[in-house]
C-alpha cells in the first residue's frame, strides 16, 4: 500500500499522518500544498466523496483572514477557491488507491491497514 498525503509541513495533523505511516513502514508520497497546489481533478475526487463544503478548513486562520466566516460561499465557488488558495483546505487529505480520507483519523487508518494486510 502507498499513501499519498496532501498537507503542509506546518500542519500538525499532516505530521501525525506522516509519522503514523513511517512507524508502520508504509510508503508515503507527501504533497506539500505550500509548494504545489492540489490539482482540480484531485480536489474534485475528494469533493465527490465528502462534498466541497467539507474540504474548507472553517477553523483555520486563512478562512477568517479572508472574511469567509461571515460570507456565504456557494458550492460552485469552493473548488476554484481551494485551487487558488490551498491554505483554505482542511488537511491532511489522504489517498491510498481508491480509499480517501479527509482530516486525520488514526483509528480509521489502523483499520484500513489491518484490512490491507496479507
Language-model segment annotations:
Residues 1-24, 28-36:
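Local sequence-structure signature of Cys/Sec-based thiol-disulfide redox active-site neighborhoods
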Residues 33-118:
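Thiol/selenol-based redox catalytic cores and closely related redox-interacting motifs
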Amino acid at each position: 500500500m502507498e499513501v499519498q498525503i496532501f498537507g503542509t509541513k506546518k500542519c500538525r495533523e499532516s505530521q501525525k499522518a506522516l509519522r503514523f505511516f513511517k512507524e508502520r513502514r508504509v510508503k508515503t508520497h507527501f504533497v506539500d500544498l505550500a509548494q504545489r497546489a492540489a490539482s482540480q481533478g484531485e480536489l474534485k475526487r475528494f469533493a465527490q466523496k465528502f462534498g466541497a463544503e467539507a474540504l474548507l478548513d472553517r477553523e483555520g486562520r486563512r478562512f477568517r483572514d479572508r472574511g469567509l466566516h461571515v460570507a456565504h460561499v456557494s458550492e460552485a465557488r469552493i473548488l476554484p477557491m481551494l485551487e487558488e488558495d490551498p491554505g483554505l483546505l482542511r488537511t491532511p487529505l489522504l489517498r491510498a488507491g481508491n480509499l480517501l480520507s479527509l482530516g486525520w483519523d488514526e483509528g480509521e487508518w489502523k483499520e484500513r491497514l489491518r484490512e490491507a494486510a496479507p
